[in-house]
Amino acid sequence: MPIDWGATGDFWSGIGTILGAGALIYAAKIGKGAISDFRLQKVAGREIDVAEQVLTAAYRARDAIEGMRGRFMPAGELEAAEKQLKELGLTVDGMPDADKSAHIQRGVFYRRAEFFKDDFNAVFDAIAPARVFFGAECVDSLRAFPKARNYMLSSADMLPMMSHSNSPEDQELQVKIRRDLYGKWRDEDEDGIGQSVINAMTALENQLLPIVRSTKND
């Protein structure tokens, strides 16, 4: 029986078309999967980057708060604060020693806050990506650091007002103010600002360190 080469060619051509279409569909599926995997990898990589950014900002702010609370104020720091107060129009010469000291100490805390400004700006820069990737709880923990700084500055503002008060109630308030500014003196003392920083740092580490460290296990 003679072979119909024309029909055979049409047959194989049809098979080739089907196989070619199947290959295209398979390639499309593989390509789509590869793109999805690539996107997932990019998202995961971005999540790790943001986790590192948030933790770094938190560590910087925590260290900045510790720096602001340093109990030792060298003469140069006190003199610089006094000079700045005079430049701002506040004349401390002639004030009672207690009032003058209180104003200068207040100035020291504001100068320290200015010195560490970039560390707190790093926290503000991390808030938006933290909200996108990790939610409101992470943002609340981040905000604890600038809140602690602002609370300290509010307590510093009260130093001049409390410098000449001797009532028992005001003396108790003075103790609280100084704990706000310098931290606790004894382990059993209360330190609301310090505890808020510890709580925030613990929450961030519990949430984000596993994400950052996951790269070491890959």
Predicted regions and their residues:
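Transmembrane helix-loop junctions and nearby membrane-interface residues
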Residues: 25-35, 64-71, 155-159
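Short, charged amphipathic alpha-helical segments flanked by flexible coils
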Residues: 77-84, 165-171
